[in-house]
Amino acid sequence: MLTWLQRNSLTFPPLEKAMRDPNGLLAAGGDLSADRLIQAYRHGCFPWFSEGQPILWWSPDPRTVLFPDELHVSRSLGKLMRKQRYRVTFDQDFDAVIRACAAPREYADGTWITEAMQDAYIELHRRGFAHSVEVWDEGELVGGLYGLAMGQLFFGESMFSRADNASKYGFATLVQHLREAGFVLIDCQMPTDHLHSLGARAISRQTFADYLARHLDQPNHATWVC
């Protein structure tokens, strides 16, 4: 039975209570307050829903992740990076990145990054949890992504691209930055061909929970202004 969250409580049900079909649906309801979102990521779940649906919280099994040392850079992407085809910054325009990620896609009917979701993550950015990666081509924002950094873990949320390999360029740059800063895992949530091409793979929900327990409260050395 699906658990409905109460607005006056930040408690989530145990991860093993998540449904098998649909895979990983853990709870519904609650709100998108910054405190609840922080608790959700610490617990091992994330919000994902469409306009008109209640807030849905997920913890899929298996979980798609990328270990920084396993980043795969294709020949074409490596060529672009060696040429420094784009300029990459961090936290220079979080609002623009999340708006671009929320924009309609040709292959989708709508967006799960609702206005309420955008406002929630902008607040997390103000609090220092959410960060953006911007990819620039001569002053034009052509790609980027955003997510949360907590301890030695980074929780990726969404990315966009308006130019050849721009989102992969930004993601690869981020992974290199995180590796140097002592991060051990990047949560990619759900599997996609795009992420698998970069080296992402599946681990069990329990293994993911073990990483949370060991690394959420460990220090990292990341700087986010460049």
UniProtKB/Swiss-Prot annotation:
Gene Ontology BP annotations: protein catabolic process
Record keywords: Acyltransferase, Cytoplasm, Transferase
An MF annotation (GO) of this entry: leucyl-tRNA--protein transferase activity
Enzyme Commission numbers on file: 2.3.2.6
Catalytic activity line of the entry: N-terminal L-lysyl-[protein] + L-leucyl-tRNA(Leu) = N-terminal L-leucyl-L-lysyl-[protein] + tRNA(Leu) + H(+); N-terminal L-arginyl-[protein] + L-leucyl-tRNA(Leu) = N-terminal L-leucyl-L-arginyl-[protein] + tRNA(Leu) + H(+); L-phenylalanyl-tRNA(Phe) + an N-terminal L-alpha-aminoacyl-[protein] = an N-terminal L-phenylalanyl-L-alpha-aminoacyl-[protein] + tRNA(Phe)
GO terms for cellular component: cytoplasm
Subcellular localization(s) per the UniProt record: Cytoplasm
Pfam families: Leu_Phe_trans
Disulfide bonds: none
EC class name: transferase
Predominant subcellular localization, coarse grouping: cytoplasm
Gene3D superfamilies (alphabetical): Leucyl/phenylalanyl-tRNA-protein transferase, C-terminal domain, Leucyl/phenylalanyl-tRNA-protein transferase, N-terminal domain
Its biological purpose: Functions in the N-end rule pathway of protein degradation where it conjugates Leu, Phe and, less efficiently, Met from aminoacyl-tRNAs to the N-termini of proteins containing an N-terminal arginine or lysine.
Family per similarity comment: Belongs to the L/F-transferase family.
The protein, known as: Leucyl/phenylalanyl-tRNA--protein transferase
Source organism: Pseudomonas fluorescens (strain Pf0-1)
